[in-house]
Amino acid sequence: MEINWNQIETKWQAKWNESKDFETNPNEKPKKFITVAYPYPNSPQHIGHGRTYTLADVHARFYRMRGFNVLFPMGFHYTGTPVLGMAKRIQSQEKEILDGLRNVYHVPEEDIKTFVEPIKIADYFHEEIKSGMIEMGYSIDWRREFTTIVPGYQKFIEWQITTLKESGKIIQGSHPVGWCPRDQNPVSQHDTMGDVEPKIDDKNHLVKFKFGEYIFPVTTLRPETIFGITNLWVNPNTTYKKIKADDEKWIVSEECAKKIEFFGKEITIEGDIAGTEIIGKYATALHNNQEIPILEAEFVEPAIGTGLVMSVPAHAPKDYQALMDLKAKNHELASKIEPVPIITTEGYGEIPAKEICEKMGVSDQSDQKLEEATNELYLKEFTDGKLNDKCGDFQNEKVQFGRNKVRDWLMENNHLEKFPVLENAPVKCRCGTECVVKVLNNQWFLNYGDEEWKETARNCFDEMNILPSKITTEFKEVIDWLHERACARQQGLGTKLPWDKDWIVESLSDSVIYMAYYTMSRFVNDETIKPENLTKEFFDYILLDKGDASLAVSTSKLSEDVISMVKKEFQYFYPVDSRHSGRDLVQNHLSFFVLNHVAIFEKKLWPQEIVVNGSVMMDGAKMSKSMGNIIPLRTAIRDYGADPIRLAIISSAELLQDADFNMESVSGIQSKLESLLEECSNLKASEIGDLKAEDKWILSRTQGMIAQVTEAVEKMRLREGLQDILFSFESDLSWYAKRVEAKGRDNVSGILHKINSTRVAMLSPFAPHIAEEMWEKLGYTELASKSVWPEFSKESVDATSIQSEELLKS
């Protein structure tokens, strides 16, 4: 039976819309509040985006059939600068972006012309994404829809950000951030090409050496190793810059001079000096006045750090091998240098770098094995190493603690200062500019570095359900390394800081507790509540149970009945029972979601569950415009049907694995669904009568399938559950057909009708449109989505028949 997928989907979407079953209000049933990260509308969604939303929809539909009152809402995240950068690129007629809009996303030319206005871009793709979600069959309560720039939501964000500031979670100060020099704004994942979160390594420092009237600032991650320095490395092919940095004279690479302009220093270029003019001379270590020779090394990259490197050959494999290479050439200065051991580590002798280079068979300083040697030795010394007697007052300190003590000592004496770097450079802003690290002064930060706040978040993670459970360690690692994060910027769409209107709340700070706004957004949308009614006292009373109803009534100018209705709605639906998102948001949004909930709400309102999924590949390759393998979701729906796409995404991988989407699997799923629809069309409900042994067996096996699928869906092992419904059970049906045929029976339609009713009901959350069509063919008048999820019945399992059939099979 060949299916017209789009016709069937349109038919059932109209019936769902008419029935209003997905419009959820409080009632006497137990509730499930399921949310998924709202999309940023700067492009249409493609098949990869469809995975997260499809998984969440299966979850919502499953619990609805289990008798829960399920709220599954959706909003749209307009906040930030991406559409601003996009509008600038369109205005300057950038070929790459225009080609993508025309040839990949098929945006009409008349719409592209309006895209010089950022809001037009967001509005266009908002409607495009929403249409795609409806066409995919997502069971969303659209009455609660909002964007993050509507006045009601902005009132909510003003309250949220004020509450955080009043509790000391927002501070003002100086801190390094990822920065776009063109837009003059901090950047985060939503602002960069490829959605890359700029990772700042703020453990990098400059150690200062004296060179005549100049300072040689040298970057290091290991300040404790200054006691083992034997020489400095300079690239003979680099021309360095003489600069004035505030009141000090420095020699650094040209690339470094540009970087430190963003550190709040006043920089003046005074001239050039060739690397060859420096090599062979001596610098002075400020901490002990030791004369340090300067040697040549072509491995020194001017773009990394300051373009100058300090050498600790006893403990740095790269330094050791570079020194050995020079010694092999009978280099006069190098021949006088011997490694100075300053760390003792169990399992290593006096010169650990020498040992590990020899063990790994490193040949010279270009050997790629040096990277592995470095990582292995650095980790071992950090965890197990102790500083020796050459380290003065720091003797016997463990490296992991002594490092910070040496750092603080050097900093107190002005021998060291911070030099934050972009760990995952190059990162490009959506406007096309390469991002840098900037030290912002008088910036507003969320103080995610606060240890007490971190510990509360850890407690929340310990008590919540995280699927799959192995992702829990990633969350804890994020909490460990998180530090102050800029929560405002001076450009972009969004909500202004209530106390400083020059700043706008940034996109990863206004998207952390918005799930609470879903519980009241329908009242704002139908104008029961106006934005001006949303006062601080209103939010305090509804969301925090602070103050009293009379204060909320007097400040909001709302009736007590309306206030009571909104409060009951919030108290009924909160907390969030399950939060769905992709793995790429673990390091920011999902962690911030937990941190902000524990900062604002009482414990009983903390999130109950987080579900994290992997991404989607196309025929084994990452989806990208450059590879030409991006398929917009709506295009795929038109070409293949929503349900085949849903099932292809689900069946290709378990939760955290990257799903590999391919047309072969879509075609196979289409055939399977067509076959099942035809089978359902030929079955009629009829009296079953006395059960034979094979009937008892197949009905028992059906109960086993119910138990397995139910457990799989509860644990979000959807691939496994779908496999059981569509494929694994087929072998049981084939055996049953053989047994029936062997006995010459032709009256088993009633049993097959019962079994397939069970299968179709369980298929409904996965492939809702075709399941409704099958359900109708089976003779049911109610919607499949309103049917009850099949319950496992132990009484319906006949152990004797199972044993008998297994004996027959064998």
Where are these regions (language model features)?
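Structured, non-catalytic alpha/beta "coupling" segments that mediate domain-domain communication
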Residues: 71, 223-261, 408-448, 666-680, ...
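Amphipathic alpha-helical
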Residues: 8, 13, 166, 170-192, ...
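Short, solvent-exposed turn/loop segments enriched in Gly/Ser/Thr/Pro and often Arg
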Residues: 28-30, 38, 73-82, 145-153, ...
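Residue-level signal for inorganic ion chemistry
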Residues: 16, 77, 168, 323, ...
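N-terminal catalytic cores of NTP/NDP-binding nucleotidyl/phosphoryl-transfer enzymes
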Residues: 24-88, 148, 157, 218-221, ...
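Conserved active-site neighborhood of enzyme catalytic/cofactor-binding cores
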Residues: 39-74, 96, 180, 194-215, ...
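Residue patterns forming the tRNA-binding/recognition surfaces of aminoacyl-tRNA synthetases
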Residues: 2, 11, 15-19, 90-227, ...
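Protease-associated
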Residues: 223-308
